[in-house]
Amino acid sequence: MTEEIQNWMHKAFQMAQDALNNGEVPVGCLMVYDNQVVGKGRNEVNETKNATRHAEMVAIDQVLDWCEKNSKKSRDVFENIVLYVTVEPCIMCAGALRLLKIPLVVYGCRNERFGGCGSVLNVAGDNIPDTGTEFKYIGGYQAEKAVELLKTFYKQENPNAPRSKVRKKE
């Protein structure tokens, strides 16, 4: 792992830890443009009660704000961003990344339930007409660390789950 990737992934894991500390699925990400963070996010699904507030979507909103404040065309910025994220983007997020023409995603562990970079569907690389541009992805950076954070979260009881869905932990 290059020092640059290690540095950005370390910061993404800080975002994931913040998500965990706030009762969210521990996923964190950074969007890096011209060697600076222009968007960062962590899952905010539980606190906003909005199932679309994944780390990547939060970061996309921050990039749009950054572009507006810095008089940059968002299209030009997104086409030159590298996304560093602790877990493989889900199908929804991979679709958004593709539509925005983000060229490269570096992620930690695979997302075996919802992964959009090949674990479930290859939204990133399949030839899908009228859905943006394929993007490259590199997975496996600190995968064990990402999995441990996820295990920690799923060992807890989700206080936001409906009573009928709460499972007893053994």
From Swiss-Prot:
Catalysed reaction, written as an equation: adenosine(34) in tRNA + H2O + H(+) = inosine(34) in tRNA + NH4(+)
Function: Probably participates in deamination of adenosine-34 to inosine in many tRNAs.
Protein name from the UniProt record: tRNA-specific adenosine deaminase 2
Binding residues annotated for Zn(2+), in chain numbering: 54, 90, 93
Enzyme class: hydrolase
EC number(s) from the headed UniProt entry: 3.5.4.33
UniProt GO BP: tRNA wobble adenosine to inosine editing
InterPro entries: APOBEC/CMP_deaminase_Zn-bd, CMP_dCMP_dom, Cytidine_deaminase-like, tRNA_aden_deaminase
Organism per entry: Xenopus tropicalis (Western clawed frog)
